[in-house]
């Protein structure tokens, strides 16, 4: 009986030894190499040449000729927008994402920010920094909260993350609207999929964006960045958005037109925003977002998961088993749609 040939797995990440050892133990056919790298030039040519599975965030070979054995790329990101136009986008190998690890922490982050905006947290933080107790009149006029119960939240991108946000928002008594590319289910199998239905949301399509926005007291952006979604929330969209709405963006900066958002905030049409993602990252020191009134800001951390290593091991191990058995992989990136 012929022994199956070994498959070389290369990680450019920084998983602990116990993680790598467990992957080896589960899949003895796998030859596991980890070389933490910031650029492809830090990986020796002989390693590239024998790599069959590449697990990486943003370190890719210069060309297909560098990786003649490559058969699959496992991304350490939920999105694939950073790959379009790169050397690997057109390679005839499957791309898989790490989607499914972050829906719960991201949904909890969104609810935290919805509550923070509703309870005027940006202004409250300003009061704390000023170090002076405001008068009752000032508190009444500037720190009066909104209620989430009975308000409407619109979620742009009603997939795994959006559905979990919708589920939690429903528990707060909010009416939930979801906007998604199609009313059907995306083809393929996905890691961590638990919400089989739309969690009671009223669904819209992108063609109905302005009607959707007109109903939103709160707008949450969770969709992937693609050619279709880039600049989707622009000046025209803010014009259609319900007066005084608040925005939370946990997706990608390029989906929301930052100039249009700034105009909306300063005019009062947008009553507040919570931003975890930006056009330019890292956000430069001195950028107006750091001190923009009415804005809560975090440095792209909404998707951080305390059990990231354990969840990633389960996803990667499942996909390795599928790959070795010739089965369909989880979280396949649809290149036609860009995610």
What are these regions (language model features)?
Residues 93, 99-152:
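Phosphate-binding beta-alpha-beta segment of Rossmann-like dinucleotide-binding domains, i.e.
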Residues 283-284, 292-314:
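Adenosine-phosphate binding glycine-rich loop
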Residues 107-126, 167-174, 314-327:
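Oxidoreductase and adenylate-handling cofactor-binding alpha/beta cores
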Residues 158-159:
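Glycine-rich Rossmann-fold phosphate-binding loop(s) that bind the pyrophosphate
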Residues 183-288:
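Rossmann-like adenosine-cofactor binding region
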Residues 162-163:
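N-terminal Rossmann-fold NAD(P) dinucleotide-binding loop
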Residues 127-137, 328-339:
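A short, charged, Gly/Pro-tolerant segment at domain boundaries
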Residues 1-99:
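An N-terminal-biased, well-structured beta-alpha scaffold segment characteristic
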């Amino acid at each position: 009986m012929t022994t199956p040939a070994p498959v070389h797995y290369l990680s450019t990440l920084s998983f602990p030894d116990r993680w790598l050892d467990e992957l080896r133990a589960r899949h003895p056919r796998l030859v596991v190499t980890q070389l933490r790298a910031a650029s492809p030039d830090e990986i020796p040519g002989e390693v590239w040449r024998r790599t069959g599975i590449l697990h990486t965030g943003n370190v890719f070979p210069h060309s297909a000729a560098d990786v003649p054995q490559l058969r699959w790329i496992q991304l350490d990101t939920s999105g694939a927008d950073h790959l379009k136009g790169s050397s690997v986008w057109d390679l005839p190998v499957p791309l898989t994402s790490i989607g499914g690890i972050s829906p719960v922490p991201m949904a909890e982050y969104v609810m935290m920010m919805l509550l923070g905006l509703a309870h005027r947290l940006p202004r409250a933080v300003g009061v704390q920094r000023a170090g002076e107790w405001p008068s009752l009149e000032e508190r009444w006029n500037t720190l009066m909260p909104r209620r989430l119960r009975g308000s409407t939240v619109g979620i742009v991108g009603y997939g795994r993350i959006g559905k979990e946000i919708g589920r939690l928002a429903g528990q707060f008594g909010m009416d939930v609207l979801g906007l998604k590319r199609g009313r059907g289910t995306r083809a393929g199998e996905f890691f961590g999929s638990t919400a089989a239905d739309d969690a009671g949301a009223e669904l819209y399509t992108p063609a109905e964006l302005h009607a959707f926005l007109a109903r939103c007291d709160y707008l949450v952006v969770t969709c992937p960045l693609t050619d279709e979604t880039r600049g989707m929330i622009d000046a025209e969209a803010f014009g259609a958005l319900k007066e005084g709405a608040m925005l939370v963006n946990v997706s990608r900066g390029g989906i929301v037109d930052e100039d249009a958002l700034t105009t909306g905030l300063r005019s009062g049409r947008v009553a507040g925003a919570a931003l975890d993602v930006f056009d330019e990252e890292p956000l430069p020191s001195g950028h107006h977002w750091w001190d923009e009134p009415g804005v809560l800001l975090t440095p792209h951390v909404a998707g951080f998961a305390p059990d990231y290593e354990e969840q990633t091991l389960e996803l990667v191990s499942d996909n390795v088993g599928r790959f070795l058995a010739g089965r369909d992989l989880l979280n396949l990136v649809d290149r036609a749609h860009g995610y």
